[in-house]
Structure formats: structure tokens, C-alpha cells
From Swiss-Prot:
<keyword id="KW-0689">Ribosomal protein</keyword>
<dbReference type="GO" id="GO:0019843">
    <property type="term" value="F:rRNA binding"/>
</dbReference>
<dbReference type="GO" id="GO:0006412">
    <property type="term" value="P:translation"/>
</dbReference>
<dbReference type="GO" id="GO:0015935">
    <property type="term" value="C:small ribosomal subunit"/>
</dbReference>
<dbReference type="GO" id="GO:0000028">
    <property type="term" value="P:ribosomal small subunit assembly"/>
</dbReference>
<keyword id="KW-0699">rRNA-binding</keyword>
<dbReference type="Pfam" id="PF00203">
    <property type="entry name" value="Ribosomal_S19"/>
</dbReference>
<comment type="similarity">
    <text>Belongs to the universal ribosomal protein uS19 family.</text>
</comment>
<dbReference type="InterPro" id="IPR020934">
    <property type="entry name" value="Ribosomal_uS19_CS"/>
</dbReference>
<dbReference type="GO" id="GO:0005737">
    <property type="term" value="C:cytoplasm"/>
</dbReference>
<keyword id="KW-0687">Ribonucleoprotein</keyword>
<comment type="function">
    <text>Protein S19 forms a complex with S13 that binds strongly to the 16S ribosomal RNA.</text>
</comment>
<dbReference type="InterPro" id="IPR005732">
    <property type="entry name" value="Ribosomal_uS19_bac-type"/>
</dbReference>
<dbReference type="GO" id="GO:0003735">
    <property type="term" value="F:structural constituent of ribosome"/>
</dbReference>
<keyword id="KW-0694">RNA-binding</keyword>
<protein>
    <recommendedName>
        <fullName>Small ribosomal subunit protein uS19</fullName>
    </recommendedName>
</protein>
<dbReference type="InterPro" id="IPR023575">
    <property type="entry name" value="Ribosomal_uS19_SF"/>
</dbReference>
């Protein structure tokens, strides 16, 4: 269920401060964050944000199409290795 419009989008305050500082000094270094629940704002476009997936930080370059989505959507937490194949070949 989406967030109520009267509440507005959520962004972690510490992440917002890091983004504003990076935009102000035009810094291109990745911003490291653990806040997967934060919404991507328009002023984040063009920045690289390293999002924690539980094990490591995944660098994500923010584009215009990502605005309005959550950071956690772009850093997968589970690895899918495919279904295991049958070890015995069935004879007919």
C-alpha cells in the first residue's frame, strides 16, 4: 500500500544532509547509506549512492526514471542461483 499523500515522501535526515552537501560542493564520490527506505528525490539525480544490501554496499547511479522510487528497490538482497537440475536422467 502506498504512502499517504498528506504525509509526503520520506527521506532519512542524515542521507538528505549528505546529498545536499555533495550537490553543494559538486562531489562525485559515492554516498554510503544504510537507509533503503528513503525515497529518491530529484536533487539526487546524477549522484552515485552506495546502498547496503545486508552484506555489502552496491553503487547505484541515480537517473531521472528512478525519482519517486525507494533506494532499496535497486539493491537486491537475495541471490537467485536457479533451480537445481535433476541428477538422474529419467529413462523411458
Amino acid at each position: 500500500m502506498p504512502r499517504s499523500l498528506k504525509k509526503g515522501p520520506f527521506i532519512d535526515i542524515s542521507l538528505l544532509k549528505k546529498v545536499e552537501k555533495s550537490v553543494k560542493i559538486n562531489d562525485k564520490k559515492p554516498i554510503k547509506t544504510w537507509s533503503r527506505r528513503s525515497t529518491i528525490f530529484p536533487n539526487m539525480v546524477g549522484l552515485t549512492i552506495s546502498i547496503h544490501n545486508g552484506r555489502s554496499h552496491i553503487p547505484v547511479f541515480v537517473t531521472e526514471e528512478m525519482v519517486g522510487h525507494k533506494l532499496g528497490e535497486f539493491s537486491l538482497t537475495r541471490t537467485y542461483r536457479g533451480h537445481t537440475a535433476d541428477k538422474k536422467v529419467k529413462k523411458r
